[in-house]
């Protein structure tokens, strides 16, 4: 496991705007522990990108080009080999780790559900929140009505890894956590890719509510989910190969239109 440590005198992250900047970032899993800055098998090479606060940016491209890796660097699940990532102009390594992660919400395909109650699982987003706050978050993520059909309601034990819940219900709990946590930066990493199309459509409605007013970075496999993004970043092994809005990218022949048309044909078949 990779050990991430605080700076000597870390800055507590407070009242951030949510501007994110990747500056010449180099990263490779094989090179994380190498000494003397020696770099091998890098997934990200001299990667630079600015994300304005309050904007929704989508990362698309084939598997293995570093989309998930890139977003995992923001909360410092890993540290860059070289270059820097800045939030509001400050290198994220200078922020106190706990406060950095407190300001970042992360929704992924494989939702972490532990074997406690539904209420405890929602509280994971903000330990110590009131019952009213928990219920409010559940209503916003459209899972309150389902919870109220259960005999024990919010005190229902969900079983290890949420074995009693469907994929859609688990995802709604993870979205309720975000409403409760209320982070300035939100990462959606293939959040709906494990769901069927009908469930995905419902979850998208919950996600549309939770993204309002935040800086949002989306990793998307299904391109149908990111058409409203302020900017779509198309990645390949060589870095960024295209960028723009959905309509702009569809209008030209290139990586994005090829990906989009291939998926569209796949869905129609």
Predicted segment positions?
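Surface-exposed, proline-enriched loop/turn segments that connect beta strands in immunoglobulin-like
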Residues: 8-9
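HAMP signal relay module
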Residues: 2-3
């Amino acid at each position: 496991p990779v050990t991430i440590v605080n700076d000597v005198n870390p800055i507590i992250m407070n009242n951030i705007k949510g501007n994110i900047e990747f500056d010449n970032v180099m990263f490779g899993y094989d090179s994380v522990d190498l000494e003397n800055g020696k770099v091998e098998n890098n997934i990200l090479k001299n990667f630079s990108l600015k994300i304005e606060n309050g904007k929704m940016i989508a990362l698309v491209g084939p598997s293995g080009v570093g989309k998930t890796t890139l977003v995992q660097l923001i909360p410092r699940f890993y540290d860059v080999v070289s270059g820097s990532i800045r939030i509001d102009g400050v290198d994220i390594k200078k922020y106190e780790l706990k406060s950095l992660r407190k300001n970042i919400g992360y929704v992924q395909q494989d939702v972490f559900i532990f074997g406690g109650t539904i209420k405890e699982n929602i509280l994971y987003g903000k330990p110590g929140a009131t019952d009213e706050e928990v219920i409010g978050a559940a209503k916003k993520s459209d899972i309150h009505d389902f919870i109220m059909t259960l005999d024990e309601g919010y005190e229902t034990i969900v079983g290890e890894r949420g074995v009693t819940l469907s994929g859609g219900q688990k995802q709604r709990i993870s979205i309720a956590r975000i409403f409760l946590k209320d982070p300035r930066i939100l990462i959606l990493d293939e959040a709906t890719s494990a769901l069927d199309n009908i469930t995905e459509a419902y979850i998208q409605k919950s996600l549309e509510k939770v993204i309002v007013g935040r800086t949002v970075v989306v990793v998307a496999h299904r391109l149908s989910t990111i058409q409203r993004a302020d900017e779509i970043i198309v990645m390949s092994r060589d870095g960024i190969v295209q960028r723009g809005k959905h309509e702009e990218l569809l209008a030209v022949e290139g990586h994005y239109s090829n990906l989009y048309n291939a998926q569209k044909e796949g869905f129609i078949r």
